[in-house]
């Protein structure tokens, strides 16, 4: 029934007359119904440009403090990362990296180590920037396989860093 009313309100001339027999009456209730159906089909008024998420606006920013970076954790994680990257890139040495595996691993390790030591503050703070920096630095130095090395670094970091942080700090 509602579909017929909608169809009658939208394009009465294009429909077959037998479909309009129930909805073509001119009673006041059918016109009210048509208006309410059409009212629901219209899009909502646009939101103001300065729309702010109420939850974020009302939340106290003190609730979102992260701990300081832990240099010992950064050193341990960097050595694990270097070991893994050396193993991973050696597997693809012939395809992408050639004789530059150690140089590429050193670049990636230096960048990740700096990030972990100064910027990583626990789960939720692992950013994409160090991995973009890895790719850019490898390319700037003219070394091969920048995208592949950055991808391998991201895969390892996603799998290990947050988990190792939780084990290190005892937050399970």
UniProtKB/Swiss-Prot annotation:
Q: Cellular component GO terms, alphabetically?
A: chloroplast nucleoid
- The transit peptide segment here is 1-54
Indicate whether Cell inner membrane appears among the record's keywords: no
Where in or outside the cell it occurs: the entry states: Plastid, Chloroplast stroma, Chloroplast nucleoid
Q: Does the keyword Protein transport apply?
A: no
Q: Which UniProt keywords apply?
A: Chloroplast, DNA-binding, Plastid, Transcription, Transcription regulation, Transit peptide
Q: Which InterPro entries match?
A: PRIN2
A GO BP annotation: regulation of gene expression
Q: What are the protein's GO molecular function terms?
A: DNA binding
Major place of residence: plastid
Q: What is the stated purpose of this protein? A: Required for the activity of the plastid-encoded RNA polymerase (PEP) and full expression of genes transcribed by PEP.
Q: What is this protein called?
A: Protein PLASTID REDOX INSENSITIVE 2, chloroplastic
């Amino acid at each position: 029934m509602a579909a017929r009313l909608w169809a009658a309100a939208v394009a009465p001339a294009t429909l077959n007359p037998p479909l309009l027999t129930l909805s073509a009456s001119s009673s006041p209730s059918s016109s009210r119904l048509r208006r309410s159906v059409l009212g629901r089909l219209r899009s909502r008024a646009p939101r103001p440009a300065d729309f702010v998420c109420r939850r974020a606006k009302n939340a106290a920013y003190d609730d979102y403090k992260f701990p300081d970076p832990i240099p010992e954790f950064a050193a341990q994680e960097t050595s694990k990362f270097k070991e893994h990257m050396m193993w991973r890139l050696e597997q693809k040495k012939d395809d992408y990296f050639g004789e530059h595996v150690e140089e590429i691993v050193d670049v990636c390790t230096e960048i990740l180590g700096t990030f972990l030591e100064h910027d990583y503050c626990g789960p939720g703070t692992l950013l994409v920037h160090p991995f973009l920096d890895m790719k850019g630095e490898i390319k700037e130095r003219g070394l091969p396989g920048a995208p592949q090395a950055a991808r391998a670094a991201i895969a390892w970091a996603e799998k290990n860093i947050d988990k190792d942080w939780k084990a290190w700090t005892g937050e399970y």
